[in-house]
Each structure stands twice: as structure tokens, then as C-alpha cells.
Amino acid sequence: MDENAIRAAIFIQKWYRRHQARREMQRRCNWQIFQNLEYASEQDQAELYKFFNDLIKHMPQAAGRKNQYQGSAHVSVLDDKDDLVEEFGDIVNAKIELPIRKNHIDLLIDVFRKKRGNRLHPKYVALILREAAKSLKQLPNISPVSTAVSQQVTVCGDLHGKLDDLLVVLHKNGLPSSSNPYVFNGDFVDRGKRGLEVLLLLLSLYLAFPNAVFLNRGNHEDSVMNARYGFIREVESKYPRNHKRILAFIDEVYRWLPLGSVLNSRVLIVHGGFSDSTSLDLIKSIDRGKYVSILRPPLTDGEPLDKTEWQQIFDIMWSDPQATMGCVPNTLRGAGVWFGPDVTDNFLQRHRLSYVIRSHECKPNGHEFMHDNKIITIFSASNYYAIGSNKGAYIRLNNQLMPHFVQYISAASQTKRLSFKQRMGIVESSALKELAVRMRDHRDELEDEFRKYDPKDSGYISISHWCKVMENVTKLGLPWRLLRDKLAPGTDSQKVNYNRTLDLLDTDVILEAEADGMSVMDALYANKASLVAIFNIIDADNSGEITLDEFETAIDLLVAHMPGAYSKAEMLEKCRMMDLNGDGKVDLNEFLEAFRLSDLHRKEQQDENIRRRSTGRPSVAKTATDPVTLLADKISKNTLVVEHDIDPTDCESKVIDPKKS
């Protein structure tokens, strides 16, 4: 081979390696955006848990008092006669009756896979939910699973409303049976659009094959989480005249879902993980039925909340493994812990287990080993963040408990038609849109901080100052230098035009995405039970009204134990503002109305800020070739999703050799 040919080969090799490195850097950057945003969002929601925890810890007299809202919500919901009414629109003519058998499963799959007209009659929805709750109630907290008869078992992770992935699993692996048992490891709903169908199908599978389907509870089997992440809105939109009754049945299902499973007494299957204080013996003895919501504590007559058992449930639902030693609070999620390999070894030794299968985290390949293969993460929702963002997977374990992984991507035909560049463009656009929506929550603060570094009002600041502001304000821990060209397009290599960043946040595609989302305040007001629980805790004398003295007592306790976390003066002023009729007391209606008005004012202020900015400061010209306009158009086009009937055969899958993985 002559010298020129060798040089050409080396040049091509260098170019290819640089290209591959750039692709991998882009993939990792997008993944970090998705994951950090997901954890930051859950951290917001976990603040509600923290608030309850602080109140109960420092107001122990409240923990033994009955929460009237919760107490009345669960007394007889399974025994009452259905008071369901007819729904408007198309209701499919599919009859479900007890006992549920395989023919009913086939009927449900055929109904649900259709893009349109996939609503069951509400009486059949109630039938499935009621019977499932009654049956689940009889199960232990930790379900024993055995391969003695079947010689194998399949474990699925998070599905998050991805009905297409569930149908792919059933198509590839077969329906449950005595020779083909399944464990579904929580997080059936939220985020995806077909959460109700996923939940109903899983519960129907359980009713049809009770000895071959095991359902574990995840952290999203919780009405507080559902209020934030879309499932409650999904049920309301599909059954607008019966959603309250259906959601009450769903709460009953949640409270009786088992907390985990143990396979052949050697493998623990739980949704999140564990901490250094987790005890399976204690978990087995907990009355799980009182934990309708993990994020909202149960308050019952004369029975103070046991924080130890509450923490046990919280840790197995919310925790994640870490590479470093020790057990520390999970600051990314704001709940649960990070547990290291030493914690895993100790936990397995104490409980005589071989390894643990958990879910709770999206992984690029659908699964991941950690802690010397003693922790296996399985995630079954493919295309979770965006089309092509990740593969889903499930595990098949044989009688020797050797795991075999099956990877898949649902709706494969949609990605086959796309080039790699197009797939990466879709993932990147989805990541940027989610990030921009999150940034809009801090838009005013971003603008104020940018201007501090621009005293001459030139519209430009240094790259380091731009990155510093982005991190200090959002606290997302992202590689901002890599994102600068995306979030401030069209700027030079030395300075950043921060107005480009602000203009991007005001584009139609970002405003529409923000409107489709739900804030913590939205979720809190939508889930009035949380507000009622807070009200009842502060109402020390159980009079049905909060006096200024009672409010001040609660504030004093919080301020004393958490200095700097709360401003007493500001909170007292907020209490006075809640007193709408000026009688010196705040009743429940005033308490709820104050939250509604506060959220309404917040939204009106956002609209006013947009109008003010459009006229109050010089904006970058919006032309067809303007960088911000081009980026917004790219995001809008690349995040367009067309719905089709679900075809479970439309998938790509392969079996992974566990030795190679």
C-alpha cells in the first residue's frame, strides 16, 4: 500500500472518530437534559412530602387527628352501588363480565389498540377496578413468586402509559399463564397518553391469571403524582362525567397494590431500591392500605403516624443506586436515597438474597447492571423521552435465576424511515423544548441576572457569565457551554446575545408546551386532598377554621427547626390575605380559594410579562432567517407526533446475552 493510501486511511479514520465522538457527546448531552429535568420535576413534587413531613414532625398533635377528607374517601367506595352516568361521545360496544377470562383480554387489547373509539363503558371500567382492588387487598405486602412450576418468569419495568410497549411485550413474550408468569414492577401510568388503558389491561390480566401476574406499586401509583404528571387529566378527559368516581376506584387499587415481590426467596423485585435502614420484615408487617398516597401521610383517629414505616415505604419506592459507597439523601429527586455497593452488600446479606431487580430510572438500552451485577435496573417504556431516545426491555429469568434481556423499540416503522441525523434531531428538539419550558419558570430571574453583567445594556455578556447565570438560576447541573449555541443561537464565539435566549422562551412553540404542562401549584390545587390535609394539620383545635394564632404556631415550629427555610413575616401576611371575609379566621373554602386565586394571578402575570416584554425592550428582529425563529421552527417540526392504531408487530427486538451486557 502506497503512502498516499495510508494517509487517506488515517485521515478517514480520524474524521470518523471525531464524528462518532461528536455524536456521542450530543447523545449524552440530550440524555442529561432529559434526566435532570425529570429529576428536578420530581424534586418539586417531593417538596410537598417534605412540607407534610416537617408539619408532622414538629406538630405531633396533628398526626393523631383524623383527616376528614381522607377518612370519608375510602370507607365504602368498594361496597357502594355504582352511581355512574352515561358518557357523551363514542363508547365502544364491548361487554366485560365476571369472571374475566382470556377472551375478555383479547377483546380489551383489540379495543385499546385503536387510535379512536377506545373508551370502555364506565361501568366496565368500574367493574375491573373494583374487582381488582378487592382481590389485591387479600395479598401480602411482599408477594412470593416461584419458578417451581413455570421454570421461568418475566419481569417488566416502568410502562408510564406506553400501551404500545405493553402490547409489544405481550406479543413477543405471550400472554400470562401458569407456565409464563409476569411481574410488573410499578409506574404503570403518568406521562404517556394511554395510562388508563395500561392500568385496566394489567388489572384485567391479573384478574384473569391471578397466579401468573404480580403487580408491584411504584412511586407514580399515587394520586399526588398523578395530579402533576397527567394521569388525572387523562381520566378526566376520557370520562368527564364519571372521572371522580373512577379516580376513587383507582385510589383503592393503589392502596392495595403489593409493595414488592421476592422470587424463589432469592431475588427481591421492588420499584426503587432500599436504604441502609430498610427492613423487609418491617415492610411485611405494615398496613399498606392506609397509604393511599405515599406523598400525603395518612391521619387517623387516635393513631399517630409511624414515621419509621412511612420512611420504609418511601425508600423502596423512590431510591436509586450510586457508584460510590454509603447512603445519602437523593438530592436530585428530592426524595428517597442514593445507596452504594456497600449498602447493597449489607442488605443482601441481612436478607439472604442474591440480587435485586428494580426499575424507576430510564436507561438508554432499557436495562443496566450496577454494584457488581447485584442491582439490575429494568425499564420497559421505549421512546420514553422522544422517538428514538431509548430502548425498552424486559427480563426473562430461568429456574437458576439467570437473567436474559429482550430489548425492543415500539412503533419501529416510524424510526426506520428516519436517518440517524433525523432521529437525533427529534431527540435534541424534544430535549430543548423541555428545557426551555423549565427555563420559562425562571424567565424574569434570568433576565435580571443577565442584565447585572451587562451594565451598558448592549445585549451581550461573556460566555462564562451566561453559563454562570444559567446554572445559578435553574440549578439543573447541565453542560451549559455545550448548550450555548442551542439556547442562544446566532451569537459569536466570544460573547453571548442573551436576548436570543429570552426570545426563545417567548416563542409560540414554548408557550404552547408550557400551557400543556402542569405546575406544582396546578397539581396541588387539582389534588385538593393535599390542601385539605395541610389545613387539618394546622387547624390544631379541629374547629374547621385556622386562627392567626394557630397559623403562627405552625410557622414558629417550622422556623425553629428549619431556620432560613421559611419567612415568618411573609407567611403571616399570606395568612391574613387568605382571610377573604375579614373575620380574623380562615375556613377551608377560603384556604382553597386562596390557592386558586394565587395560581390565577400567577398565570395572568405571565401573560402580562409577555406583553410587556414585546413592547418594553428591544427584541431581536423576527424574520424567516432569524436564528431564534429557525430554532423554534425546528423544535416545532421535530416534535410533531402523528398517532396511529397500535400494531404490536411493528417493533424491533433482540435478545441480549447477559454475559456480554
UniProtKB/Swiss-Prot annotation:
Its cofactor is Mn(2+). One of its GO terms (cellular component) is cytoplasm. Keywords: Calcium, Hydrolase, Magnesium, Manganese, Metal-binding, Protein phosphatase, Repeat, Sensory transduction, Vision. Residues 441-476, 526-561, 566-601 form the EF-hand domain. Ca(2+) 1 binds at residues 539, 541, 543, 545, 550. It is an enzyme of class 3 (hydrolase). Its EC number is 3.1.3.16. The keyword Hydrolase applies. Ca(2+) 2 binds at residues 579, 581, 583, 585, 590. Binds 2 manganese ions per subunit. Residues 606-625 are annotated as: Disordered. The active site is at 220 (proton donor). It catalyses: O-phospho-L-seryl-[protein] + H2O = L-seryl-[protein] + phosphate; O-phospho-L-threonyl-[protein] + H2O = L-threonyl-[protein] + phosphate. Gene3D superfamilies: 3.60.21.10, EF-hand. One of its GO terms (molecular function) is protein serine/threonine phosphatase activity. Pfam families: EF-hand_7 (PF13499), Metallophos (PF00149). Residues 7-32 form the IQ domain. GO terms for biological process: calcium-mediated signaling; detection of stimulus involved in sensory perception; negative regulation of opsin-mediated signaling pathway; phototransduction; thermotaxis; visual perception. Belongs to the PPP phosphatase family. Phosphatase required to prevent light-induced retinal degeneration. This is Serine/threonine-protein phosphatase rdgC. It comes from Drosophila melanogaster. The lineage of its organism: Eukaryota, Metazoa, Ecdysozoa, Arthropoda, Hexapoda.
